[in-house]
């Protein structure tokens, strides 16, 4: 089965067990792209802030899949799913359970005595009401109905995070804080304001995301100076598209492809030793394998890294299928996944 690891990494024993903070801004494109292509935005103030705090910014980093659900399910399972080889039905699979119910990352954390907390802006990931694998979540199922699509209730993730942080200092903590800024251009053609207006809106929301991230990071460093902090986008902002569903029309345009798949990764390691031993991290699917092997000081787990490839669904009538859009080394690659 696709979820099974090729080694015993679920039994890995971490030598270093800092509190781990995963902050995920939706649709945050990588610093290496934001000055270029369709974005053309100077984000140096925030980039310099992270550098001054000691973060490593991983240039060229990208997601392996095009959406929040498809990307995060691969992130937390630490494996490729290839949209389950079903391009027409990919949106129907229950990716949510791989994010918040049961996954490899949660198993490893719990095996190392971590308490786990999920703090999110709205119930989008909770919408299918899966069982919770996290010890706590900031939104109650009583707050929304079974037919929830998008919107209310909206929680202030900063306030909820401040309430939750450091409640039990006796055991290591993992916090996954997810918020939907800067987000991406409109999903549908009918909702689009046109690519230029969509870009302007994305930049406005980027500024809000930067402010929130600064507040989150500053709060952590004040309360927990030995923290491990990860800023990890789920996918790109799709700036340059009129609407996100255009990604399912085949394109060879490098800047459009990277606008969808490029995403930010910045890590503040809890010690200079761990910072110096930080590996090169290229894509979402391998983030936690790299993280855990560094905390365990055990390089044997590099033998089963997943391919750093980005995969897309194409729904063009004549070319329908699942395509590798970006190859191992960042090259544009239009190889079609064999039908299975």
Predicted segment positions?
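A short acidic-Thr-Gly-centered motif at the start of a beta-strand
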Residues: 5-16, 221-223
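A structural signal for short, well-ordered beta-strand segments and their strand-loop junctions
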Residues: 22, 57-60, 115-121, 175-176, ...
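Transmembrane and membrane-interface helices of multi-pass
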Residues: 1-2
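His/Cys-centered metal/cofactor-coordination and adjacent catalytic loops
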Residues: 18, 29-112, 282
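Catalytic-adjacent loop/helix segments of enzymes that bind and process anionic phosphate/sulfate esters
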Residues: 83-220, 261-264, 275, 279-288, ...
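Short, solvent-exposed loop/turn segments at secondary-structure junctions
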Residues: 25-30, 55-56, 63-66, 80-82, ...
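Metal-dependent active-site segment of extracytoplasmic phospho-/sulfohydrolases and closely related
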Residues: 209-249
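Beta-strand elements within well-structured catalytic alpha/beta cores of enzymes
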Residues: 14-34, 50-53, 109, 173-179, ...
């Amino acid at each position: 089965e696709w979820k099974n690891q090729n080694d015993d990494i679920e039994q890995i024993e971490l030598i270093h067990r800092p509190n781990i903070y995963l902050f995920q801004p939706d649709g945050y494109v990588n610093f290496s792209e934001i000055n270029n292509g369709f974005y053309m935005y100077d984000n140096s103030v925030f980039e310099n802030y992270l550098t001054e705090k000691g973060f490593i910014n991983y240039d060229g980093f990208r997601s392996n899949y095009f959406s929040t659900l498809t990307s995060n399910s691969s992130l937390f399972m630490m494996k490729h799913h290839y949209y389950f080889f079903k391009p027409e039905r990919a949106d129907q699979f229950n990716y949510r359970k791989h994010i918040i119910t049961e996954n490899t990352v949660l198993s490893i954390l719990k095996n190392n005595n971590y308490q786990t907390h999920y703090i999110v802006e709205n119930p989008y990931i909770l919408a299918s009401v899966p069982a919770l694998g996290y010890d706590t979540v900031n939104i109650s199922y009583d707050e929304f109905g079974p037919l929830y699509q998008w919107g209310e209730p909206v929680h202030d993730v900063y306030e909820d995070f401040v309430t939750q942080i450091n409640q039990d200092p006796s055991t290591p903590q993992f916090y996954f804080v997810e918020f939907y800024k800067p987000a991406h251009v409109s999903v549908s053609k009918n909702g689009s304001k046109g690519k230029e207006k969509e870009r302007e809106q994305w930049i406005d929301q980027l500024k809000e995301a930067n402010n929130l991230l600064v507040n989150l990071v500053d709060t952590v460093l004040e309360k927990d100076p030995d923290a491990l902090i990860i800023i990890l986008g789920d996918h790109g902002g799709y700036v340059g598209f009129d609407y996100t569903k255009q990604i399912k029309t085949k394109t060879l345009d490098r800047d459009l492809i990277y606008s969808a798949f490029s995403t930010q990764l910045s890590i503040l390691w809890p010690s200079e030793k761990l910072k110096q031993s930080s590996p090169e991290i290229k894509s979402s699917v391998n983030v936690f394998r790299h993280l855990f092997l560094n905390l365990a000081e055990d390089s044997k787990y590099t033998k089963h890294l997943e391919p750093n490839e980005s995969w897309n669904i194409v729904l063009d009538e004549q070319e329908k299928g699942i395509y590798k859009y970006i190859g191992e080394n960042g090259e544009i690659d239009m190889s079609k996944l064999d039908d299975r």
